[in-house]
């Protein structure tokens, strides 16, 4: 179909998800911790870098499948680095660390978004509904954790990107949700993606 990628996913879908993830990160993580003028700079920088990462990784992910795992690992490293910067005691007073954390999160999230959405290209309706339901549930849980216990969040920020990368690594490139024994079902994929 015209305007679609090699896997059948329209480009505007993952562009939209990237914008959503960037907005969510900025609202939940930076909205209450930075001054308005600094938050504006971080917001703009993260948005630009996220879109640039999507454009840069688009041909790599959809046309050179052998690099998917490398891309997932690189994105995970960026997200873990972002979590480390956010959890650092120095980040309380260092604007540069906040900016670096936002940029690392923007790039890592953008790449993982593209990777996950590429898995949805050939899933059936039941798999997609399971994925969507668990995505919403995981989003709700993460929001609750952020609001009720923000001091504990760095623990989740370190663990969840690694989990997501491991699940991407174990997935065959030609199947969005493997059904073979021992492979995680669509529910696990929805929950894993929902935390980003």
Annotate each language-model stretch with its function:
Residues 170-195:
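Flexible interhelical linker loops that connect adjacent transmembrane helices
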Residues 93-115:
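Hydrophobic core of transmembrane alpha-helices in multi-pass small-molecule transporters
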Residues 46-51, 124-150:
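Glycine-rich segments within core transmembrane alpha-helices of 12-TM secondary carriers
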Residues 109-133:
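Cytoplasmic helix-loop-helix junction between adjacent transmembrane helices
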Residues 2-51:
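Helix-loop boundary and gating motifs at the non-cytosolic
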Residues 51-71:
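Helix-to-loop junctions at the C-terminal end of transmembrane segments
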Residues 154-174:
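Symmetry-related core transmembrane helices of the 12-TM Major Facilitator Superfamily/SLC fold
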Residues 57, 75-92:
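C-terminal ends and interior cores of transmembrane alpha-helices
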């Amino acid at each position: 179909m015209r305007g679609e990628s090699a896997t059948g996913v329209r480009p505007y879908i993952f562009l939209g998800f990237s914008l959503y993830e960037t907005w969510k990160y900025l609202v939940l993580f930076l909205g209450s911790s930075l001054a308005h003028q600094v938050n504006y700079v971080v917001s703009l920088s993260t948005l630009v870098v996220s879109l640039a990462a999507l454009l840069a990784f688009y041909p790599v992910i959809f046309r050179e499948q052998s690099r998917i795992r490398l891309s997932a690992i690189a994105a995970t490293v960026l997200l873990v680095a972002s979590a480390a910067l956010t959890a650092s005691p120095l980040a309380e007073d260092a604007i540069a660390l906040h900016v670096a954390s936002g940029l690392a999160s923007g790039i890592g999230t953008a790449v993982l978004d593209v990777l996950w959405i590429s898995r949805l290209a050939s899933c059936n309706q039941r798999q997609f509904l399971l994925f969507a339901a668990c995505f919403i549930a995981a989003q709700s849980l993460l929001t609750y954790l952020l609001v009720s216990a923000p001091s504990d969040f760095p623990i989740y920020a370190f663990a969840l990107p690694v989990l997501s990368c491991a699940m991407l690594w174990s997935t065959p490139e030609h199947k969005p949700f493997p059904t073979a024994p021992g492979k995680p079902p669509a529910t696990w994929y929805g929950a894993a993606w929902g935390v980003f």
